[in-house]
Amino acid sequence: MPTHQGQEFKKTCSPHFYPLSNMAKFNDIQLLRTTFLRGPSVWTYRPVLEVWLDLGELEDYPSNKIPGLNDRLTAWLPDLIEHTCGVGERGGFIQRLEGGTWMGHVLEHVIIELLNLAGMPAEFGQTREISKRGVYRMVFRCPEEAVARVALEHGHKLLMAAINDEPFEIKPAIHAIKTAINDRYLGPSTGCIVDAAGERRIPHIRLNDGNLVQLGYGAAQRRIWTAESDQTSAIAEGIAQDKDFTKRLLAACGVPVPEGQIVATPEEAWEVAQDIGFPVTVKPSDGNHARGVTLELYQEADIKTAFALAQPEGSDVIVERFIDGTEHRLLVVGGKVVAATKGETVSVYGNGTATLRELVAVLNLDPRRGPEQEYPLDWINLDAGAVKLELNRQHVTPDSVIPQGQAVLLQRNGNMAIDCLDDVHPDVAYYAVLAAKIVGLDIAGMDMILKDVSQPMQGQGAILEVNAGPGLLMHLKPTSGAPRPVGMAIADHLFPREDGPGAGRIPVVGIVGTRNNAFISRLVGWLLQLSGKLTGVASSEGMYLANRQTQKTNTANWAGAHRLLTNRLAQAAVIQTTARSILEEGLAYDRCLVGVVTDMDGFEQLADHDVLEAGQMRRVMRTQIDVVLDGGAGVLNADLPEVADLAELCDGEVVLYSTEAANEFIAAHRANTEVQHEGGRAVFVKGNQVVLATGAQERVLGTLDALSLAGGKRPDTPALLAAIATAWALDITPDLIGAGIKTFEYQA
């Protein structure tokens, strides 16, 4: 299956072109159909948006026949020079533009470049002409449909403006795509975990429009929501949210924490501060992200003001002893410290002419500063209560002109974005892990105050807070130091490496074709169930779980398979699909353990997809074999040469089946010792017997008469062989296969 960007656009230029002099503007390229393919498809393994384009009169005007087109495109999108296209070298696409390529191909590259500029590299696109002149199928990779459609809209507008020599504003287009990305994409914490799981070939399913994600399939799945997992208990999270109770719990277990007390009024805050001793910290009891926290307070007025700042951020307000030192955030995952950062105060320095407001405006231009979920450093807001309090303590206002060299402190806490993992003393790590265990969190962010993180904890630091669902961005994009692979640490915690390469996966069997595939699906599901796995089946005859029908309508589609793969009870899944579903939706799974192709019938029903002859079905049906895992198997009908020829595409083993023992494909496969030392595996009928063969070795499973279903019902022979071959590919024993067939009660 092709996966590279901008595969060569194969079309030769027509010799007939019309002059452009005195010609009216070109009509818009028509977008006839848009289809989001959510899984592996005829194009690639990942989601793509497929667009049918009608070029209209532009069919007669490739890129080298429209004066100024290429100059306008490269002026708006200068990085098109980086697109290699089918040429395979930098500038390849520019060569195609200059030599003449059609507008569907140009639109593909325009959209890819807009996505690149918006911060989401697309990396893949293709354009192919269909049987109708001037109509093309164009696809580009994008994991989110809403983002893809926005990119298509603006790419279309940009191209038409370039064609017709009209103005176009590139910045608003990029901004619109960025907005769609921010609205639809996973947050940085969730995203880095999903990406890490992907590196280990663990599949994921997004369960809502937010950050709730399933990693893995069926019973092997785990769920995450930002940096929380399904191992994060509600009780532990509730404890962590109650800062005062957390401190008391930690103190009872010998963990150093600052002395403090919940207060109800500003007056009580002042009284408690006097009892504890100055300086003090005032903060909300259940806040986060350092909101409402004010440090190192001495004065009554400041303490009462700090109370007012903390109160809206939590249910209660805490006054606690201020501990001198530097703020640190240690990330604990599965009983290990996997990342650590420290903070620093934020100050600006006067130049004798600029106001504080002007100095802060310059500070906020730092590209590392921005909205807290996207950037390691926050913007400084002079209207924020904590900042105002700091300025009041220094007797300056936003409009004060700051003398040359004078420092103005703006922020004492937050923005712990300087990596320091390599400096963490084992004793400090011990207390961080201990605190996480006491609270009961598998993933926790420890806010600690330390004079020196490289020294033992006692006497020079304390744990301030234990945070559930900690932000990970500070560890992914520290302002100084090395980024840490925190996403992989969490993925490894959820799916231990010792689980092997199949972590997160259940046996998935994918079956495509038209010949009794519902029967095959259900019989394979029954045999898997007998082998000890609670098995789900999604077929055209409904959905089954543990051989119990849970849905009567057709589930041989993306939606049915998706429901099955999200079911936490399913220890194995058998999924029937169709050529139409592959063309209109894509497969619902990224890979399967066994892929079965029974036939390539049905092109007559696919004319609306420009499938007009039998030979075109190979491109569709190969999708099922393309997704077979390298440790899996492809099961192919050797009675049909066009199906047997798919064997060359399979990354795993191939098991053939045939109604004839003398089948030439079977004979060649059994003799092939390059793939398997003993020779290939095959299932066939010899006389009246069903034979399982590995190379020259043969085992009789039983006669066709003996392999009847419960009640003596005789199944269709090719369908029976397909099911037997699939079960055998799943390493179900021949004895169990034979016994299971005889006990299978089938009613369509």
Predicted regions and their residues:
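Extended, charge-rich helix/loop segments that form flexible
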Residues: L359-M416
